[in-house]
Amino acid sequence: MTQQTPLFAQHQASGARMVDFHGWMMPLHYGSQMDEHHAVRRDAGMFDVSHMTIVDLHGARTREFLRYLLANDVAKLTQPGKALYSAMLNASAGVIDDLIVYFISEDFFRLVVNSATREKDLAWIVEHAAAYGVQLTERDDLSLIAVQGPNAQQKAQSVFDDAQRDAVSAMKPFFGVQAGELFIATTGYTGEPGYEIALPNELAAEFWQQLLAAGVRPAGLGARDTLRLEAGMNLYGQEMDEKVSPLAANMSWTIGWEPSDRQFIGREMLEIQRTKGTERLVGLIMTEKGVLRNALPVRFSDADGNMLEGVITSGSFSPTLGCSIALARVPAGIGEQAVVQIRNRAMPVTVTKPVFVRAGKPVTN
C-alpha cells in the first residue's frame, strides 16, 4: 500500500501528476517539468521531500559510533549545527546509502537518509549502534520541505518569524538550526542555495501554503532529478549501490582518510581499491539530437588503442544547457571523447567532469 505525505492534498490542489515513488505517492510534476526546473534555477521552487527518513541518534558515545559507521569523519563536526555528507559502507566498501549527518550536541546527532533504502538503513544502524549504547528514533512525526533557488532563502525568510530569521541570518552552507517549530538547514539537492526545512506534520500544509503565497513554485520529482543531474549530484541506486565503491562514484572527497588509525566499516577494502584503482564517474555532453539515457553503453579507446566500455548511470535532457547530459561510470583511461550507442547510431559525446551547472550557470570543464 502506498503512503501519502502530509502535503498530499496540497499537491492535488496544485494539479500535480502523482506517481508511486518507492511506496510513496509523490508529485512528478505540476504541469510542466521544464518550467519547474527553470523556476528553481532562476527564482525559487519547493519540493515535498517528506518521504525522506529522518533519524535522531542519542547517547554519550554517538560521535564515537558515527566515526565507525560512516566513511566521512564526524570529528570534523565541532560547531553545533554543522553538517556533512557521507557514505555508509558495507565491509566490501559498497555504498549502503549516502546521507547527511547534523551535529546538534555531543549526545545528539541527526541523520537524513534516502526513502528507498529506509528499512535496510535502519536495520544496519540499529545493528551497529547497540554496542555503543546509542538510541535511534525515527522522526516520522516530521515533514520535510526543500526550498531551492537564487531567491529561495529570501522568499522563505518572508514566512519565518523574527526569531527564525535571526537564527538563519548568518548561517553558512551545510548547517542546521532548530528555530521554534522549524529545523532549518542550508542544504539541498539542486546546486542552488536554499533551505531544507523539517517541521511537525500538522504544520506542513499551512507552511506550504505560506510559501506558495510568497511566490515559491511547487516542483516535482522530474525537475528534482534534472536539477541534481545538472549539479552532478549522485542518486542512490544509479551512481552507487552496495556493489559500487565510493571511489567509482566521485565520492572520494567524502572519505575521511585521516587519521589513518580510525577504523570505519569498509576501510580495509577501500584502502585496497585506493591502491589498485577503480572505475571513475565522468560527465558526458551530447550536442547532437537525441537523449542520453540510463544504462546505455559508453565506448572509447584508451591511450594504447584498446577499446573500453562503461555505462551511463543517469542521463537526461538538460533544460539549462539545452542539450543532453549524463553521468557515466567508466574504466580509467578515458580521454575527452567517447561514443554512446543510441539505437543503431554511435553518437559522439564530450567527456567532462561530473558537474554541468553551478549557481545557475554552465560549468566550463
Swiss-Prot record:
This is Aminomethyltransferase. It is an enzyme of class 2 (transferase). GO terms for molecular function: aminomethyltransferase activity; transaminase activity. The keyword Glycosyltransferase does not apply. InterPro entries: GCS_T, GCS_T_bac, GCST_C, GCV_T_N, GcvT/YgfZ/DmdA, GcvT/YgfZ_C, TrmE/GcvT_dom1. Keywords: Aminotransferase, Transferase. The gene is gcvT. HAMAP family: GcvT. The glycine cleavage system catalyzes the degradation of glycine. Its EC number is 2.1.2.10. GO terms for biological process: glycine decarboxylation via glycine cleavage system. Belongs to the GcvT family. It catalyses: N(6)-[(R)-S(8)-aminomethyldihydrolipoyl]-L-lysyl-[protein] + (6S)-5,6,7,8-tetrahydrofolate = N(6)-[(R)-dihydrolipoyl]-L-lysyl-[protein] + (6R)-5,10-methylene-5,6,7,8-tetrahydrofolate + NH4(+). NCBIfam families: gcvT, PRK00389.1. Pfam families: GCV_T, GCV_T_C. GO terms for cellular component: cytosol; glycine cleavage complex. The glycine cleavage system is composed of four proteins: P, T, L and H.
